[in-house]
Amino acid sequence: GEPTLQPELPEFLEKIRDLGYAIKLDTNGTNPGMLKILLHNGILDYVAMDIKNSPRRYAETCGGADILSRVQESVLLLQDSLADYEFRTTVCRPLHTEREMEEIGRWLKEAKRYFLQPFVDSGSLVSGGVQAHTRDELARLRQAVLPYIPNTQLRGI
């Protein structure tokens, strides 16, 4: 689940840090209030944030109309912070096209790093109609983002 929904997260992560461990947060960005606390307190060494789709198709992809504004706030928090971070998108057909990727690129322009990850059908989370992109399609999706985010890479292929 989403770790930033846990109200005790800052205290828990402080205990982990006190043990000498670095802290990486994986988040969907829907709780910018908690992210702001964690960034402000300097608890996080690295943040990996999911970007589900272009702003135009975010609600369609995530099933919530109010999610986008919270995710946009989290994007700005990360881009304005000193924390190291990445954005990442798990791409699949038909949700992610070159148009969507270009829109994401414009939205996240000059992000530190952005990863495209291929969808893998586990059979348990997604109903029918969603398919993985081919390697060539993934390469084209990456090319659509590169003019905006030069450090765009493919992961997991």
Located regions from the model:
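Acidic carboxylate-rich catalytic motifs and surrounding loops in phosphoryl-/glycosyl-chemistry enzymes
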Residues: 152-157
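Conserved AdoMet/S-adenosylmethionine-binding subsite of the radical SAM
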Residues: 4-137
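Short acidic donor-binding/metal-coordinating loop in glycosyltransferase active sites
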Residues: 1
